């Protein structure tokens, strides 16, 4: 056995170990819903006047940085998102949810469907009657809940990546963090 074969085998085994560790980390995070967030380059501020009613959505763009463990580390990344008011009442961060509009299946831009009558027949056939707005990927009909971006239907391997609403003032909703995996896979 030559040194070249041993080095090649060690490199291969090292790559296999890294792949298994990455898959295990992701499975662990999904199983225990322990989502880790990273700060955005600067918080996104959405006027509260644009989110007065439940199920009212507002699009935004956020700037982040890829993680040190990403294929291209510490690079600027622009993320399109949508913030939604979930219910009436006092203006606390829990009343608002924000998601990344990039489908985790193949990276297509997800659409906010505010009118349940516009939901494709394939989706209603799979999940039943729709009474609330949804996020739908136009590429393969992956469908996600408005409440938290969790997956309802389709080939997407998981729900939408989430942003963290960090504060709500008298005039604005502030989005200051994004789910760590969004910075690895975008």
What are these regions (language model features)?
Residues 1-20:
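N-terminal secretory signal peptides and thylakoid transit peptides that target proteins
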Residues 18, 109, 114, 143-145:
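Secreted/processed peptides and extracellular or luminal domains of membrane proteins
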Residues 28-125, 167-186:
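N-terminal pre-ligand scaffold of iron-sulfur
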Residues 103, 137-139:
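Short cysteine clusters
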Residues 115-118, 122-135, 145-176:
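Polybasic, low-complexity binding patches
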